[in-house]
From Swiss-Prot:
Keywords: DNA-directed RNA polymerase, Magnesium, Metal-binding, Nucleotidyltransferase, Transcription, Transferase, Zinc
SMART domains for this protein: RPOLA_N (SM00663)
HAMAP family: RNApol_bact_RpoC
Stated role: DNA-dependent RNA polymerase catalyzes the transcription of DNA into RNA using the four ribonucleoside triphosphates as substrates.
Similarity comment: Belongs to the RNA polymerase beta' chain family.
Binding locations of Zn(2+) 2: C795, C869, C876, C879
Subunit structure: The RNAP catalytic core consists of 2 alpha, 1 beta, 1 beta' and 1 omega subunit. When a sigma factor is associated with the core the holoenzyme is formed, which can initiate transcription.
Source species: Clostridium beijerinckii (strain ATCC 51743 / NCIMB 8052)
Cofactor note: Binds 1 Mg(2+) ion per subunit.
NCBIfam families, sorted: rpoC_TIGR
Name by which UniProt lists this protein: DNA-directed RNA polymerase subunit beta'
Residues binding Mg(2+): D450, D452, D454
Length: 1178
């Protein structure tokens, strides 16, 4: 049986006129649509029922046949087939054109395919197509040239001179069709290949482009003359509907207008041809027909667009596909789904980690079919119809059934914007009163949700498989780690931290200080009867079993710490339990701040896995809320204490600045130096005031507690409240040298207030711009890496990359340990001192192995990397390493490309927009933040280019009055000199050794330059470390492997330089694995291999260069992608995720992979019988 959804690939091509007629159910002859009185479609019109099918189910046009029993009969009066009205969504019609017209995509696109295949310029082509010039089709004996253009006057003269029959010339699409018809693709291809060998420069480029088009037609089996249309397909009427509005007027799709113009002009042309009208009139009509068809296919591509009422350009067929509102992005990639609801969220502190509160009204609507089925099953209702009535009337017994149905049926909660995969998680629903969804407070961080009016959507997984996946893979309790860096995302926040912090504080001289208790329980009891304070330092005897015998020891602690440790497993490895002295201590014997809580959760996850961790998190949550209420930490203005030292520090600063000004006035220092020193001094003073302030605050000061615990606020905010606001930036980003001396407690004067407003306003503007930019970056990243999926266990490569710590100047940005954890080694790691193998090749490195390698003093390690993976589609599990979200080895089928894109895109909003103005760099500022990331991923030439050394050697600096020059002397005596522009800072000193590709001046490097000097590996390493620098400086951790996935996609293509004996065309881009395969094929029969150079594409270019035309067309430049794909007769192999979503198949990742889909469960009957037999005997 042929199943519609069961196919492996999809191909696109040019449609021949025969094919179009075959699709069609009849010719549309009249421009009429619907009769406005009877509201029935006109016969042979654009909505004709005879062609497209009946408007109403099982009812013909004239009403002779009604009811389903006449199914399939064609009415003898009106000719309409009695069938479902749904066929009006799939049946097509056609229009027979009286004169051929050209297809605007192939004539007007860049490059013009029609122009290339005919070897004509698009301008000449336009003159012919739009009846401005004649073209010579066959010169016969005359001295005219083939394809020569003649204007009206020249044509007349030629006819007079040589006679009417002596040559053939024509105009319009007919002439072009004749020329296209004459082309012999095989000979053209051979001729062009010969020409290619002799030519060079611009001519060569043109020949390569022509050859590409000719080869596309030759290989795909498309006929070039099909670029000229004789028959136009008419799309089904329900896809271009016409509906009646309240006032009796009609609203219609723009396509109907465009089709109507084509039909009108076509019919008029037919009439003129029948009448034998003069040539000039016919010609004008043909030109109008050509323009009407152009507008229908792509309105506005040539000339002024056809406008509807109110000067609005009409939406043509191309516009239906393009852009965010087009078919691809609006209906195919994102659909509205049934079984969903949305509501406001409120906090649910009483919920367990895996639960959410679902309003009753919403639940009954969502679970309606399930409730109805259960009612019938339990015999409460007799049939489905009465069950439906019961649910709609909301009878009391329905609620009981709902409770049962809901019991183990997870729901998905989603909050827009869904920036990473933690934006959709599964929860076990609990019915609640009211109309708001209740959300667990620990799930807020992942969703980035707060309760100031946020809304969330609920979706219901229907099938058993979907429910299983939701429960095992998406349940909130299992999503504890962040996929981007493997750190816990469910860290307690705000009140929970504050409560835990309060609980683990200690206070000298509190009530009951120094008392001793015989056990934990006695100490807790003493606290409950208010004999001792929760922060009092007391002595408690602790018991634990060592080798089967009970031992005890008195330790110093507080009741708060005892209570806090009740909910924490006592074997997280924070205390060395082997050492007898320490082994009785509490696991958490320190202040619980946001950082330390994160560490506790991390340890718990590594030791005990997700289930225990989620239980511990719920306990911490309950404790935190309880004790933050008991602690009752509040803020009053009396808590903001201005330190006494402040005024002394300010005075001292003023004196220093006076000295600096004096030096400047005497000409010892330049203005720039003065500015820098002033800024430096004020920065230092502000810092000193802040430090003095933090030292002077009591540790029970509520503001200090909030900031120190990490619950809310930061040191810099306290500095502004009680210290001084410090330096401000002007709107341009330059720092103003007058600081704000006041704090908010003392109050700002008018000038200070005015200076403050700059920053605030710029901040708001930046945030708005940043969100859009960040979203667009994520979209491009997803598009470039969406088809990267873990496809196999091991690709068997011996290659890898060397990693060492990433530095910015002297500051370590990413440690080596962090780069090793969860990766596989690419060679044996040998201890440099003893020569022992510390870690064998191709083995997984856990944190312990990484520590061992780093502590042995090894600075550079060769690891398996996505860069060097030999997997043709996707990557292999060994080259990828650990799954950051589970801290285990990655599973086959994981969509690592999407995860990489989300991990890089999600923190995009946190990156600042600012381009920083660093003093002293003349002219060009160094871009930072989001624009810098974008610049790197798009592989653009950066602003503020650095000068790069092309060779390795020793640097020498020569200064003359006019300029500075750096000369690099290579080991082999080769010299390169670089002129340094005025105002640039040097990065090298006299007689420094520089490597090839090192920067000589400050600034950013063009990645393409690095590629030409250091090769593809150098470029990849550069991109990786540069992107890491931007993110790390903002305090965002992203694991290397995510960046590797994207950078690998940017460097996959090879540009053919010389084709050798292969079928590859010079100048074309090809996937590197296809390139190696083709070369291997040629090598087998001893031919000459092709030569190519690796290219670095920006993410937009790389996304458009994918093998899948569906994915590329739905990304950007839809018409261009489809034009090219149609000419090449491209086949989309459906390997990525996007193309499968578009055609409605399961995505080939996770359980949708073929290896999982093709599993069959078979029972071995003998085995079953044996087991049954054994059970019976027992």
């Amino acid at each position: 049986m042929f199943e519609l959804n069961n196919f492996d690939a999809i191909q696109i091509g040019l449609a021949s006129p025969e094919q179009i007629r075959q699709w069609s159910r009849g010719e549309v002859k009249k421009p009429e649509t619907i009769n406005y009185r009877t509201l029935k479609p006109e016969r042979d019109g654009l909505f004709c029922e005879r062609i497209f099918g009946p408007m109403k189910d099982w009812e013909c046009h004239c009403g002779k046949y009604k009811r389903v029993r006449y199914k399939g009969i064609v009415c003898d009066r009106c000719g309409v087939e009695v069938t479902k009205a749904k066929v009006r969504r799939e049946r097509m019609g056609h229009i027979e054109l009286a004169a051929p017209v050209s297809h605007i995509w192939y004539f007007k696109g860049i490059p013009s395919r029609m122009g290339l295949i005919l070897d004509m310029s698009p301008r000449a082509l336009e003159k012919v197509l739009y009846f401005a010039s004649y073209i010579v089709i066959d010169p016969k004996e005359t001295p005219l040239l083939k394809k020569q253009l003649l204007n009206e006057k020249e044509y007349r003269e030629a006819v007079d001179k040589y006679g009417d029959e002596s040559f053939v010339a024509g105009m319009g699409a007919e002439a072009i069709q004749d020329l296209l018809n004459e082309i012999d693709l095989v000979t053209s291809s051979k001729e062009l290949k010969e020409e290619l060998k002799q030519s060079s420069g611009q001519k060569k480029v043109r020949i390569i482009r022509r050859l590409e088009v000719v080869e596309s037609f030759r290989k795909s089996g498309n006929d070039p003359q099909w670029m000229v249309i004789n028959v136009i397909p008419v799309i089904p009427p329900d896809l271009r509907p016409m509906v009646q509005l309240d006032g009796g007027r009609f609203a219609t799709s723009d396509l109907n207008d465009l089709y109507r113009r084509v039909i009108n002009r076509n019919n008029r042309l037919k009439k003129l041809l029948d009448l034998g009208a003069p040539d000039i009139i016919v010609r004008n009509e043909k030109r109008m027909l050509q323009e009407a068809v152009d507008a229908l296919i792509d309105n506005g591509r040539r000339g002024r667009p056809v406008t509807g009422p109110g000067n609005r350009p009409l939406k043509s067929l191309s516009d239906m596909l393009k852009g965010k509102q087009g078919r691809f992005r609006q209906n195919l990639l994102g659909k509205r789904v049934d079984y969903s609801g949305r509501s406001v969220i409120v906090v649910g502190p009483e919920l367990k980690m895996y639960q959410c509160g679902l309003p009753k009204e919403m639940a009954i609507e969502l679970f309606k079919p399930f409730v109805m089925k259960k009612l019938v099953q339990d015999g409460i209702a007799h049939n489905i119809k009465s069950a439906k009535r019961m649910v709609e009337r909301v009878l009391p017994q329905v609620w009981d059934v709902l409770e049962e149905v809901i019991a183990d049926h997870p729901v998905l909660l989603n909050r827009a914007p869904t920036l990473h995969r933690l934006g959709i998680q599964a929860f076990q629903p609990v019915l609640v009163e009211g109309r708001a969804i209740k959300l667990h407070p620990l799930a807020c961080t992942a969703y980035n949700a707060d309760f100031d009016g946020d809304q969330m959507a609920v979706h219901l997984p229907l099938s058993v498989e979907a429910q299983a996946e939701a429960r095992f893979l998406m349940l909130a309790a299992t999503n504890i780690l962040k996929p981007s860096d493997g750190k816990p995302v469910c860290v307690p926040t705000q009140d929970m931290i504050l409560g835990s912090y309060y609980l683990t504080m200690d206070k000298n001289g509190a009530k009951g200080d120094g008392m001793t208790f015989s056990s934990k329980d006695e100490a807790i009891m003493a606290y409950e009867v208010k004999e001792i304070d929760i922060h009092a330092q007391i002595n408690v005897r602790m018991f634990r079993e060592v080798d089967g015998e009970l031992k005890s020891k008195i330790i110093k602690t507080t009741v708060g710490k005892i209570i806090f440790n009740e909910s924490i497993p006592q074997n997280l490895g924070l205390v060395n339990r082997e050492n007898e002295e320490e082994s009785f201590n509490l696991e958490v014997d320190f202040l619980a701040t946001k950082k330390s809580l994160g560490k506790i959760i991390d340890q718990c996850y590594m030791k005990h896995g997700p289930v225990k961790t989620s239980i511990m998190l719920d306990n911490i949550k309950a404790l935190g809320y309880h004790y933050s209420s008991i602690g009752a930490v509040t803020v009053a203005s009396s808590d903001i204490i201005v330190p006494k030292v402040k005024y002394d520090l300010l005075k001292e600063a003023d004196e220093t600045i006076e000295k600096i000004e004096k030096m400047y006035k005497r000409g010892f220092i330049s203005d720039e130096e003065r500015y820098e020193r002033v800024i430096e001094k004020w920065t230092q003073t502000t810092e000193d005031v802040a430090n003095a302030l933090m030292d002077s605050l009591d540790k029970f000061n509520p503001i200090y507690m909030m900031a120190d615990s990490g619950a809310r606020g930061s040191k810099s905010q306290i500095k502004q409240l009680a210290g001084m606001r410090g330096l401000m930036a002007s709107p341009s980003g330059k720092i103003i040298e007058l600081p704000i001396r006041a704090s908010f407690k003392e109050g700002l004067d008018v000038i200070e207030y005015f200076l403050s407003t700059h920053g605030a306003r710029k901040g708001n503007a930046d945030t708005a711009l940043k969100t859009a930019d960040s979203g667009y970056l994520t979209r491009r990243l997803v598009d470039v890496s969406q088809d990267v999926i873990v496809r196999e266990e091991d690709c068997g490569t011996d290659e890898g990359i060397f990693v060492s710590e990433i530095k910015e100047g002297n500051e370590v940005i990413e440690e080596l340990r962090e780069r090793l954890i969860g990766r596989y080694t690419a060679e044996d790691i040998v201890d440099p001192e003893t020569g022992d193998v510390l870690h064998p090749k191709n083995e997984y490195m856990d944190p312990y192995a990484a520590d061992k390698i780093v502590s042995a003093g090894i600075k550079k390690v060769k690891i398996r990397s996505v860069f060097t993976c030999k997997c043709k589609v996707g990557v292999c599990a060994r080259c990828y390493g650990m799954n950051m979200a589970t801290a285990k080895k990655i599973d086959i089928g994981e969509a690592v490309g999407i995860i990489a894109a989300q991990s890089i895109g999600e923190p995009g909003t946190q990156l600042t927009m600012r381009t920083f103005h660093t003093g002293g760099v003349a002219g060009a500022d160094i871009t930072q933040g989001l624009p810098r990331v974008e610049e790197l991923f798009e592989a653009r030439k950066p602003k503020g280019l650095a000068i790069v050394s092309e060779i390795a050697g020793t640097a020498r600096i020569e200064e003359t009055k006019k300029k500075r020059t750096v000369i690099v002397m290579g080991a082999d005596g080769e010299e390169r000199s670089y002129d340094i522009p005025f105002g640039s800072r040097l990065r090298v000193n006299e007689s420094d050794y520089v490597e090839a590709g090192d920067e000589i001046t400050e600034g950013s490097v063009n990645p393409h330059d690095i590629m030409s000097i250091k090769g593809i590996d150098g470029a990849r390493r550069y991109l990786l470390s540069e992107v890491q620098k931007v993110y790390r400086l903002q305090g965002v951790d992203i694991n290397d492997k995510h960046l590797e996935v994207v950078v690998r996609q940017m460097t996959r293509k090879i540009k053919i330089v010389d084709s050798g004996d292969t079928d590859l065309l010079p100048g074309t881009m090809i996937d590197m694995f296809d390139f190696y395969e083709e070369n291997a094929r040629v090598r087998e029969f001893g031919g000459e291999e092709a030569k190519g150079e690796q290219t670095l594409l920006g993410i937009t270019k790389a996304a458009l260069a994918t093998d899948s035309f569906l994915s590329a067309a739905s990304f950007q430049e839809t018409t261009r992608v489809l034009t090219e794909a149609a000419i090449k007769g491209k086949v989309d192999p459906l390997v990525g995720l996007k193309e499968n979503v578009i055609i409605g198949k399961l995505i080939p990742a996770g359980t949708g992979m073929m290896r999982y889909r093709s599993l069959k469960v078979e029972t071995d009957s003998e085995l079953v019988e044996e087991t049954i037999g054994e059970t019976v005997e027992e």
